[in-house]
Amino acid sequence: MAVTSPWFRAVVSAAQMQEIENWLFTQGMPVAALMEKAALQTAQRLLTLYPLSTYPRIGVVVGPGHNGGDGLVVARELKLQGYQVQVLQPLDKLKPLTQNHVDYGKSLGIPWVDGVQALAHCDLIIDALFGVGLTRLITGAIADLITTINNLPIPVVSIDLPSGIETDTGEILGVAVEADRSFCLGLWKRAYFQDRALAHLGQTELLGIGLPPQAIANVLGEVWPVQVLGADQAQQTLPLSRPLVTHKYQQGHLLLICGSQQYAGGALLTTLGARASGVGMVTVAVPMGIKALLHSQCPEVLVKGLLETPSGAIAGLGNLDLSRYSAVALGPGLGSDVGPLVEEVLSVNCPLILDADGLNQLAQQQLLPLLAVRTAPTVLTPHGGEFKRLFPDIDQGDRLTAVQTAAAMCQATVLLKGAKTVIASPTGPTWAIKDSTPALARGGSGDVLTGLMGGILAQPEKFDLAQRVATAAWWHAQAGILASQQRTILGVDAQHLAEYLIPACRQWLGPNVANWPANLSHSS
């Protein structure tokens, strides 16, 4: 079976991971061999990150299953490298393979300790209690053990997943280890993209364990159902190369409908995001009262002044010809007193992005069913509160399932904003944005994203719409990360975020930036 995506992009459930492993075992791979591969990769990474000179004393907390077995192999390897290792095994009943590693570890002289306080003098604690697949609540002595570990002033590394986190939903099963670092083994697990798990994961890293591509494809198919978007995909998705002979109208024409007297900045920030996308033309439709502001701040865009309500919001689109544009984005800064704009734009025969007050109007006027009959694609970009108003019956606890359910329900591409933004469409894979920054938790950040996304969707298509939406979210996050590195988390206001979009692009393109066509023949 052909494989179209590198293994490190796949995101799997506990059941899918178990099925992949079972396929390996039916093909003849010993369970012990897979455990050795996973644990040796973990041990090697620990040797790099936690050198003997700084972290000589290691405590390993092991559970009854194969996660505990992984921990015991790690304990063995660290012992052989000169670390002072001790093991805490709070449960007596073990799987046979795990028991084998207990016996071997004791034969090497690794000490077993009886209580968590015996680990208080350690320099590092390794959590190998439960890992992937746990579904029951943690109570009693084990809950007390985890609470004590969390209260110790010692760094904790979890193997595969912090103990106490449900693998698929990220739910905290009563109590969970608060790791400083988590090594995800083999393939990303869904919990790594659930906001409610993030406080327990710490820094995250995927460790390859040599899973054959055919094993993954046998379970997930040729295209992974849930994928992490990476820099290489973003680069391929963006229209970075252009024909030698081109002009602005061939590079897309984006219409932004946004802004009000109260939220004039929303229109400006959306425009700044669009400007960075490379789209050929941008038209901004705003209330007449803020038209001059847009002209003065963004002289290269076309500004349409629209009739406004007494409070300074857009009253209606008037004679605006929606057929002229290759994408339309509506919502940022419109305010609550805006006219019935959403119903007016639903007829556009091009990608339509609804954000902010556009989403609120969609919910208030119960227009969601109309999206299913649109002939052109629709993109909804809610944060958690807007999502609840649009889809009150969908539980957001499991964000991946929630966004997939919403996309299927309304037949639109849905981007659910959060610390881990996720994107789903009615067909095709669900995308997850792995890296972001809390610096983006600022007013106007979403406006910049809407403009950037609109500019990308307005340009000639290279990949499916959901992947282009995900690329906009990924680029937006990378700009936030770069800006926070240079300005600190406190210094990333939305205007500066927009200014970092192109520097972020140059950074992840690296040497390839020199390969962009530098001498394009064009007409303005």
Curated annotation (Swiss-Prot):
Cytoplasm found in the keyword field: no
- For binding K(+), which residues are annotated in this chain's numbering? 67, 127, 163
Domain (YjeF C-terminal) spans: 231-508
Where do the segments described as NADPHX 2 lie?
Answer: 383-389
Q: Where is this region: NAD(P)H-hydrate epimerase?
A: 1-223
Among Pfam families, the record links this protein to:
Carb_kinase (PF01256), YjeF_N (PF03853)
Q: Which CDD domains match?
A: YXKO-related
Positions annotated to bind ADP: 417-421, 437-446
- Which residues take part in binding (6S)-NADPHX 2? 333, 447
Region (ADP-dependent (S)-NAD(P)H-hydrate dehydratase) residue spans: 231-524
Q: Where is this region: NADPHX 1?
A: 66-70, 131-137
Q: Where does (6S)-NADPHX 1 bind?
A: 160
The UniProt entry, under InterPro entries, shows: Carbohydrate_kinase_pred_CS (IPR017953), CARKD (IPR000631), Nnr (IPR030677), Ribokinase-like (IPR029056), YjeF_N_dom (IPR004443), YjeF_N_dom_sf (IPR036652)
Keywords attached to this Swiss-Prot or TrEMBL record, sorted alphabetically, are: ATP-binding, Isomerase, Lyase, Metal-binding, Multifunctional enzyme, NAD, NADP, Nucleotide-binding, Potassium
Q: Name one GO biological process term.
A: nicotinamide nucleotide metabolic process
Q: Known catalysed reaction(s)? A: (6S)-NADHX + ADP = AMP + phosphate + NADH + H(+); (6S)-NADPHX + ADP = AMP + phosphate + NADPH + H(+); (6R)-NADHX = (6S)-NADHX; (6R)-NADPHX = (6S)-NADPHX
EC number(s) of the enzyme? 4.2.1.136, 5.1.99.6
- Which cofactors, by name? K(+)
The record's similarity note reads: In the N-terminal section; belongs to the NnrE/AIBP family. In the C-terminal section; belongs to the NnrD/CARKD family.
What HAMAP family does this protein map onto?
NADHX_dehydratase, NADHX_epimerase
* Free-text function comment from the UniProt entry: Bifunctional enzyme that catalyzes the epimerization of the S- and R-forms of NAD(P)HX and the dehydration of the S-form of NAD(P)HX at the expense of ADP, which is converted to AMP. This allows the repair of both epimers of NAD(P)HX, a damaged form of NAD(P)H that is a result of enzymatic or heat-dependent hydration.
Protein name, per record: Bifunctional NAD(P)H-hydrate repair enzyme Nnr
Tell me which species this is from.
Answer: Synechocystis sp. (strain ATCC 27184 / PCC 6803 / Kazusa)
